[in-house]
């Protein structure tokens, strides 16, 4: 009987305690809610429509920070940058890249590679030194990896992010950003080295104009004609100066983005970003054609940059003026098989 009374008293006590708790808690919760609403109302009244209109207009307010533009809550120019980058440059850049890939693919299957008109003789002509080849492949590796990491930063969110786990996507994009930031200055150094090393071989002359008029002997009525050329033909010189000019623009704008410690404002960074992206896209499209010619578009086109020398027939047909200059040099004489 005593146990039953204890259970009954406990069952009655618990609801009473709960009611008392709610009685004291509800006013407190209500007060908190009222205080929050009061604070929100006060903030709205303090800000007002005029305040937020000024914020949206990009007007600068007061702040204790002495850094430039720290008093600006909303950068109106940032919206313009976003639209130009995401709505125009990104899709047009993708179209240009895929268009370039489509063009070289079409060229391969319709025009085909440029073949040698005569058999190889086996006589080797020295063309590129070890230093030249090391510089070329260093630049090639740096450029291609920067292009890949840059494309990941611009287009990865459209193609990779939807199919990858969040953690893996985060690691990839972080690695791409860090690699791009640290490798960019190295690209600039290599670019200056390339300019100093090869600019004399890349001065355009009338022979190159004729080369362009005949479209390098690769298409049309001049296909297979092998127009005259010195050490570098018109196409190689065009690629060289494309690399130098747009590479310099990409390197300088990248430096501005890499080191925002020289008083750059938001608009400086936004403009540098657009210029950097535009110049990089031009370089990528240009080097799609360069890579195509080296790998697929010309017979033995890659030999010289791999081994350092080329076959005599290739030298005669593609760089006849240069061949005439170097054919009698001691290093280009046929090797005595018995020696």
Task: Show the residue positions of the predicted features.
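Hydrophobic secretory-pathway targeting helix
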Residues: 1-30
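Membrane-embedded alpha-helical bundles that constitute the cytochrome b-like, heme-associated redox core
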Residues: 5, 27-339
């Amino acid at each position: 009987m005593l146990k039953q009374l204890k259970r009954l008293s406990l069952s009655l006590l618990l609801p009473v305690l709960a009611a008392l708790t709610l009685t004291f808690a509800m006013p407190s919760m209500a007060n908190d809610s009222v205080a929050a609403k009061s604070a929100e109302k006060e903030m709205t009244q303090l800000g007002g429509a005029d305040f937020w209109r000024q914020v949206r207009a990009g007007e600068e307010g007061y702040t204790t920070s002495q850094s430039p533009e720290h008093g600006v809550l909303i950068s109106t120019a940032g919206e313009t940058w976003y639209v130009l980058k995401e709505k125009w440059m990104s899709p047009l850049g993708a179209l240009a890249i895929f268009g370039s890939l489509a063009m070289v693919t079409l060229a391969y299957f319709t025009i085909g590679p440029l073949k040698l008109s005569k058999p190889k003789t086996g006589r080797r002509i020295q063309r590129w030194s070890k230093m030249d080849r090391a510089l070329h492949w260093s630049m090639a590796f740096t450029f291609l990896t920067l292009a890949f990491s840059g494309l990941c930063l611009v287009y990865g969110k459209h193609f990779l992010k939807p199919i990858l786990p969040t953690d893996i996507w985060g690691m990839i994009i972080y690695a791409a950003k860090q690699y791009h930031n640290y490798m960019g200055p190295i690209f600039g150094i290599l670019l200056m080295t390339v300019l100093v090393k090869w600019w004399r071989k890349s001065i355009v002359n009338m022979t190159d104009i004729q080369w362009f008029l005949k479209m390098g002997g690769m298409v049309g009525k001049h296909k297979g004609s092998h127009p005259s050329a010195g050490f570098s033909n018109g196409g190689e010189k065009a690629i060289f100066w494309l690399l130098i000019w747009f590479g310099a623009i990409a390197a300088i704008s990248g430096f501005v983005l890499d080191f925002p410690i020289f008083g750059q404002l938001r608009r400086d960074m936004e403009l540098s970003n657009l210029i950097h992206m535009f110049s990089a896209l031009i370089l990528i499209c240009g080097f799609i054609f360069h890579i195509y010619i080296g790998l697929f578009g010309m017979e033995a086109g890659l030999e010289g940059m791999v081994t350092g020398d080329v076959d005599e027939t290739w030298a005669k047909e593609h760089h006849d003026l240069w061949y005439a200059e170097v054919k009698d040099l001691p290093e280009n004489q046929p090797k005595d098989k018995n020696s």
